[in-house]
């Protein structure tokens, strides 16, 4: 049996590194809000508009331990043929990840990191829609684990087709 504690790994110097996930920075990379029919689109409505929301997550290494995780949220409100508003947010975070086994990196980058970014991105979208003259759009919590599993299944299906 090893003296090494569960989850600890050796760094390049042979020293033990405790598993850690730190947020070094959070930032708005892109934010847009369009209300093409304003001010007419701001009038009271008999029924709620249809709101379509798209979510995407990407991650890129910056160094051996630092990663840029980007959460993209797009929301479009439509009433019949009229576009009430269209908003897009690209919100990123720089994460330092150390002492995590390689097999756990993708789930950490595509599930846990966006889960940490989401509340901030959600608030920015809510503020943008409110400042645009509409009720704040409070996006429901997102199941990033399900998104990740779906993404992995799609990639496996693509690689199976290529084989």
UniProtKB/Swiss-Prot annotation:
Transport among keywords: yes
Pfam families: SecB
Location(s), subcellular: Cytoplasm
Entry keywords, A to Z: Chaperone, Cytoplasm, Protein transport, Translocation, Transport
GO biological process: protein folding; protein tetramerization; protein transport
Entry keyword Protein transport: yes
Gene Ontology molecular function: unfolded protein binding
GO cellular component, one term: cytoplasm
Subunit-level organization: Homotetramer, a dimer of dimers. One homotetramer interacts with 1 SecA dimer.
Family: Belongs to the SecB family.
PANTHER family: PROTEIN-EXPORT PROTEIN SECB (PTHR36918:SF1), PTHR36918
Main function: One of the proteins required for the normal export of preproteins out of the cell cytoplasm. It is a molecular chaperone that binds to a subset of precursor proteins, maintaining them in a translocation-competent state. It also specifically binds to its receptor SecA.
Protein name according to UniProt: Protein-export protein SecB
Record organism: Brucella abortus (strain 2308)
Species classification: Bacteria, Pseudomonadati, Pseudomonadota, Alphaproteobacteria, Hyphomicrobiales
């Amino acid at each position: 049996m090893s003296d090494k504690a569960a989850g600890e790994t050796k760094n390049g110097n042979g020293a033990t590194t405790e598993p850690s996930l730190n947020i070094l920075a959070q930032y708005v990379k892109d934010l847009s809000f369009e209300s093409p029919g304003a001010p007419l689109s701001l009038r009271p409505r008999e029924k709620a508009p249809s709101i379509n929301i798209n979510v995407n997550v990407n991650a890129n290494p910056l160094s051996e331990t630092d990663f840029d995780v980007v959460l993209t949220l797009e929301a479009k409100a439509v009433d019949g043929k009229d576009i009430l508003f269209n908003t897009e947010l690209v919100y990123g975070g720089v994460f330092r990840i150390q002492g995590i086994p390689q097999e756990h990196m993708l789930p950490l980058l595509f599930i846990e990191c966006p889960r940490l970014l989401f509340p901030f991105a959600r608030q920015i979208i809510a503020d943008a829609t409110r400042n645009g003259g509409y009720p704040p759009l409070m996006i429901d919590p997102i199941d990033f684990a399900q998104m990740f599993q779906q993404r992995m299944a799609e990639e496996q299906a693509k690689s199976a087709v290529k084989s």
